[in-house]
Amino acid sequence: MIIYLHGFDSTSPGNHEKVLQLQFIDEDVRLISYSTLHPRHDMQHLLKQVDKMIQHSDDDRSLICGVGLGGFWAERVGFLCDIRQVIVNPNLFPQENMSGKIDRPEEYLDIATKCVANFREKNRDRCMVMLSRQDEMLDSQRSAQTLGEYYEIVWDDIQTHKFKSISPHLQRIKAFKTLG
């Protein structure tokens, strides 16, 4: 099972396209929708939904995949639910760049600092990061510096922030998922 978390633009047709692409490596791909506007509520909702999906799945190597803001959530929720994560152009600092787009961007900082102390150290090698060199929204180098000590970084030279095509990376994602 692969759980897919969309980014801030939840209505983008690219979400459906990525779900279809992920179905090439696992036919059971489930999209969880969340508000994107209320971080604390989103955290509770995502934890509850992901836990329920894991409990009702017979796949002992489930994976959570998130793009952009979904990457912020996938890393944390995947860690808390003990499943591997693939995060694509993750928005690691939404409290800095979501101001004016959501009600309480400062809640992201609160969530980030209250997760689990040193959670990335405890999550070492259980997350794969895909970054685009052409990301027009986020600073990919900053993301690489923040995450590179803990996780494998996969660079893409073609895709933009929304990472429309993950197809060239499907075999790598599949291999990462099978590690359980």
From Swiss-Prot:
Protein name: UPF0227 protein ECA1814
Top-rank taxon: Bacteria
HAMAP family, sorted: UPF0227 (MF_01047)
Stored InterPro entries: AB_hydrolase_fold, UPF0227, UPF0227/Esterase_YqiA
Lineage: Bacteria, Pseudomonadati, Pseudomonadota, Gammaproteobacteria, Enterobacterales
Pfam (any one): UPF0227
Family: Belongs to the UPF0227 family.
Species the sequence originates in: Pectobacterium atrosepticum (strain SCRI 1043 / ATCC BAA-672) (Erwinia carotovora subsp. atroseptica)
